[in-house]
A protein has these predicted regions:
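N-terminal Rossmann-fold NAD(P) dinucleotide-binding loop
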Residues: 35-36
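Glycine-rich Rossmann-fold phosphate-binding loop(s) that bind the pyrophosphate
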Residues: 31-32
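Rossmann-like NAD(P)-binding element
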Residues: 74-136
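C-terminal substrate-binding/catalytic lobe of Rossmann-fold NAD(P)-dependent dehydrogenases
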Residues: 155-161, 170-330
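Conserved N-terminal Rossmann-fold NAD(P) cofactor-binding segment
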Residues: 54-94, 322-330
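N-terminal polybasic/positive-inside topogenic patches
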Residues: 6-17
Length: 330
């Protein structure tokens, strides 16, 4: 029988990232459910030597960070987790995940959060600009596409260093619902959701397959249509159940997958909200598109061929993003 505290080599645990694969510091802004869960996942994956959680609520980031750090001997990670109410501890972060903002309540759309969260993200972005001017930003706060715009506008960062977490989450929901309908592993579902992070998102049926088999050969169109609609309202479905908050397990997983692709220079093709400069015939907005992520952040935007219906739906989604963008006050 092994004693408590036996070395990992005896316990058969998986190896974590080496020092050379880590970045020095990743900051999570916001210590609510999404932020705290993101910080825990980042630490468990050892993507940074230090994970900083910053929040205006006194004691909350400190208490949650201490709790997470005390899980390190059990989970087997050495990433240090610290909590703070100021930005000095976040200085020179390589990646910053912005989750700060109020959460949705039943009956609220993501756009209902616009003015309140725009003010919060503006203030956060001003702090980031002065303390971590070389950071890569991953925006999670809603309404996602517009908050990504606010962060880029206020910091002045190039588009390569400002990304929105949207399509990774929406695609995960889409894949989960398909796997459930077919009773197969989620690992075998290949799919992609583009467009704005809202009711006009565009699940690409033409690029959806199960181990290479087109989804249209496996499910009737009515079932596919129902899954597409459930994907679009996936966040609202969770809000309705929770009543006092919104999703955080899947959103945090999505944000961390993006961080991992960047830290480990994986060259992953992930659907993210990116600033368009002519791609897909659009410019001047953040929209979910296939992005190649590496150590420099956004390395390229992949333009895929779309059906006429998908092109029209993407244009409609872009219009839905532009409207609140024009209403936001900076």
């Amino acid at each position: 029988m092994l004693a408590v505290g036996a070395p990992d080599s005896f316990r058969g645990t998986t190896l974590h990232n080496s020092e050379s694969e880590m970045v020095n510091k990743i900051t999570v802004v916001g210590a609510g459910n999404v932020g705290a869960t993101t910080a825990q996942r980042l630490a468990e994956k050892e993507l940074a030597r230090t994970v900083v959680m910053v929040d205006v609520m006194e004691g909350i980031p400190q208490g949650k960070a201490l709790d997470q750090w005390q899980s390190a001997p059990i989970e087997g990670f050495d990433s240090r987790v610290i909590g703070t109410n100021g930005y000095e501890e976040t200085r020179d972060s390589e990646i910053i995940v912005i989750t700060a903002g109020i959460a949705r309540k039943p009956g609220m759309s993501r756009d209902d959060l616009l003015n309140t969260n725009a003010g919060i993200v503006k203030q956060v972005s001003q702090q980031i600009k002065s303390t971590s001017p070389n950071a890569i930003l991953i925006v999670v706060s809603n309404p996602l596409d517009v908050m990504s715009y606010v962060a880029m506008k206020v910091t002045g960062f190039p588009r390569e260093r400002v990304l929105g977490m949207a399509g990774v989450l929406d695609t995960a929901r889409y894949r989960a619902f398909i796997a459930e309908a077919l009773d197969v592993s989620v690992r075998d579902i290949q799919a992609m959701v583009l467009g704005g992070h809202g009711d006009t998102m565009v699940p690409l049926i033409s690029y959806t397959s199960v181990s290479g088999i087109p989804i249209t050969q496996l499910l009737p169109q009515a079932t596919i249509d129902a899954i597409v609609e459930r994907t679009r309202t996936g966040g609202a479905e969770i809000v309705k159940h929770l009543k006092t908050g919104s999703a955080y397990y899947a959103p945090s997983s999505a944000a961390v997958q993006m961080c991992e692709a960047i830290v480990l220079d994986q060259k992953r093709i992930l659907p993210c909200a990116a600033w368009l400069e002519g791609e897909y015939g659009m410019s001047g907005l953040f929209l979910g598109v296939p992005c190649k992520l590496g150590r420099r952040g956004l390395e390229s935007i992949i333009e895929v061929a779309l059906t006429r219906g998908e092109r029209d739906a993407l244009a409609k989604s872009a219009d839905a993003v532009r409207e609140p963008m024009g209403a936001v006050k900076l």
